[in-house]
């Protein structure tokens, strides 16, 4: 068999530039940043003439450190890894080499020297390079965990809980590094973690107990500085109580959308997707993620607000007039069941990432690419749950069902928002939320 000494430069360059070209070739989204709806219909919550749209937020401050860079070495040659490819972290060159070898069924002249594969010499011995790819576990089937043989699956899961001194498993190490990266991004971008919220709700936190809001009087005490630093911008101090609470919810939602956008930009490969696809994933995913995270600050009696400074009772929210009283109750019901799964923040980080990178969202341009990213996240989530909850045998399928439950919850919520927009003529929706709800379901 012929033993090629060098990869063709033009082929190699094509492979290495492939993903970059895809990102740079992303089309404008319906006219670019001007796509955000005008704020003239919403003066209570935003005095800005042009509040940031989802596209604007995606394009803000995105650099290599904040946009999903793992800063990991390629397992094959030691070059900088561009992502998780065929089951291991690999650079663009080794990813392309492995793909070409498999697709074209190339056979290389056998080498007995066990050549050391490094960035500077990786093209010298293709046989040893391919053998190293195989030894590290690179495989077309590695994209989807479900296609792996059961024996291999059990071996990988066992590796998660193995002692530090045990035999090194590159696939497990890559998934651990991936999970850690997602968890660190979660801690960096979200002000309220579940750990912090539960310590406040159970009275174990060191700071002052939250101020309890249970009626109109305590709400206005909270607004005067006990909980919130300032009133909602432009909101008259004695506007109808139900509308005021609705506006407060919108303020919190908009801030959480901003946090989720930054978190999404930290997920490996998210920022290399078409901008149109990034916007679509956020449009359909943020509310599912918000309602999943809402469970962290909820117990059966109420929920934390203002970063834990206040606690609004469930009964007070039920006392609001319809349709506003109907908004939060289904979220309480979901939260109580979701909290029974006893997830921690490291579990939630991967779960939220899997929600955002969902390949069946309407209007996606590159479905296979999104599905491949989500497959990696789900694989990492399943491994992580096996290690973090060894006695919870069915936790992973239960979480997949919760993803379906969240989709139904958001569908009903979006429909409710559209009804409020039509029937409550004195009530406005924030422009960013209008953009999200428009033509949603």
From Swiss-Prot:
Residues 37-54 have a biased composition (Low complexity). It holds the Pfam family zf-C4. Residues 1-54 are annotated as: Disordered. Residues 211-439 form the NR LBD domain. Residues 71-145 bind DNA. This is Peroxisome proliferator-activated receptor delta. The lineage of its organism: Eukaryota, Metazoa, Chordata, Craniata, Vertebrata. It is found in: Nucleus. GO terms for biological process: adipose tissue development; apoptotic process; apoptotic signaling pathway; axon ensheathment; cell differentiation; cell population proliferation; cell-substrate adhesion; cellular response to hypoxia. GO terms for molecular function: DNA binding; DNA-binding transcription factor activity; DNA-binding transcription factor activity, RNA polymerase II-specific; DNA-binding transcription repressor activity, RNA polymerase II-specific; linoleic acid binding; lipid binding; NF-kappaB binding; nuclear receptor activity.
